[in-house]
């Protein structure tokens, strides 16, 4: 038991493990994430609806987007931004590797007769011959990538942008980093069965890396049939 607890509380290296796919593509957690996305009153998986509406208006004005503009949203989720861009006449593509979120986004676009090109793919692997006036990565997606992955995306931005194109990222600030504290906590059925529909025990460890300005949340999920570990690393800029 002592060795098990020691392993649970062990501090990994920043971005040593990449488990995003387990969070976004798992049948159960992807449904939970979609529920968070669609709750317009909270800022969890997405910003609240009022913030999104203001942001879309600001983005369109800031970058002079119109019905001749082509936009690309990496990590589009259920289309909260892409659908609003399409409603304003912008040609938009959304890429996300959550099959559930893309399916929902496509259904909404169809019901509203919106022309949005949705692609179910890991954006690290996305390729196209199309070129774009604006590329967005919203809700701090860029911060969840390792240095190598960020390099891949920067090269992808350069490749996919038109000569006069722009990139819009939102990122976690150093103020946000300073507000976080290291913790070690334990909870039965953590976050109201977020990790599994069955009973489980969850150990939560938050680690801070001062030199790199990284926050790493480590979730050790102990179920009757298996034990899983999910790592969520976020760099603050």
Give residue spans per PLM region.
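Conserved SAM/SAH-binding beta-strand->alpha-helix loop
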Residues: 98-100
């Amino acid at each position: 038991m002592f060795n098990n607890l020691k392993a649970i509380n062990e501090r990994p290296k920043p971005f040593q493990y990449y488990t995003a796919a387990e969070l976004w593509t798992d049948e159960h957690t992807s449904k939970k994430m979609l529920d968070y996305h669609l709750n317009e009153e909270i800022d969890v998986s997405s910003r609240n609806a009022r913030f999104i509406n203001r942001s879309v208006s600001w983005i369109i004005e800031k970058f002079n987007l119109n019905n001749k503009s082509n936009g690309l949203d990496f990590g589009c989720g259920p289309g909260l931004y892409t659908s609003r861009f399409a409603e304003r006449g912008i040609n938009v593509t959304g890429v996300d590797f959550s099959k559930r979120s893309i399916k929902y986004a496509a259904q909404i676009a169809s019901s509203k007769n919106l022309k949005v090109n949705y692609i179910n793919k890991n954006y690290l692997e996305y390729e196209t011959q199309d070129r774009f006036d604006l590329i967005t990565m919203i809700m701090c997606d860029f911060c969840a990538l390792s240095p190598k992955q960020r390099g891949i995306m920067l090269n992808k931005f350069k490749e996919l942008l038109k000569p006069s194109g722009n990139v819009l990222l939102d990122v976690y600030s150093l103020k946000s980093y300073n507000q976080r504290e290291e913790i070690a906590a334990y909870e039965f059925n953590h976050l109201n069965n977020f990790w599994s529909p069955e009973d489980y025990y969850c150990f939560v460890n938050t680690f801070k890396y001062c030199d790199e300005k990284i926050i790493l949340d480590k979730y050790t999920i102990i179920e009757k049939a298996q034990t899983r570990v999910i790592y969520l690393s976020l760099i603050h800029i």
